[in-house]
Amino acid sequence: NITIVPILNDSPLKLDILDLTTGFKMGLVEVSECEQSTVGTIMVKNNATSPLLLVDGEEVAGAKQNRIIGQSMLIPPNTSIPIPVNCSEQGRWNYKSEFKHSNYMANSETRCRKAEYNMDNSIRASQGAVWDSIEDLQVKRNSFSKTSALRDNYEKIEKTNDDYLKHFGIYENQVGVIARLENKVGLDVFANHSLYEQYSDCLLYTSDA
């Protein structure tokens, strides 16, 4: 019950931009709790010589609790800054491990609810909406997580979603996607094909989570 429309561009922007997954793999990105830990903010250090792209809804797992990126942004090279986030694991506030990319993004419903508050620059107010959306997802999928972690919901349907992804390919000049689910439409567009390719599976994986 989902329709996917590719967004193509024969003249993409030739920009050298680092994505978060690659940054972690290459050891060029460090993500940590702030010196005084707070739910709504984490520190991101970009040690690369290229700008680092953080995408709205992208999840990092570990530290005191899993978080999702509060809004899309570019972090300049050799820069360390605090960034706005939302908690995606309501039932944990104890250190687990260093942050890493969780390989998942918030599902489209969670991103949509969060965005309604973020338009008013209210990350704190959006936190309740994020938790409510994750709870709704657990009910929808008849799943359970001891810490109400968004990531746990995805891991329990990983095989089903992997089979689902096999039906969708990527065009050579594709830079984004439009997804229609029932009466809702969403889209994500990137500067070029290589960036979109890094996020393609993640976006489709969570479009109908």
Locate each region found by the language model.
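Short, hydrophobic/aromatic beta-strand segments
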Residues: 50-58
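Conserved small/polar residues in nucleotide/adenosyl-binding loops
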Residues: 205-209
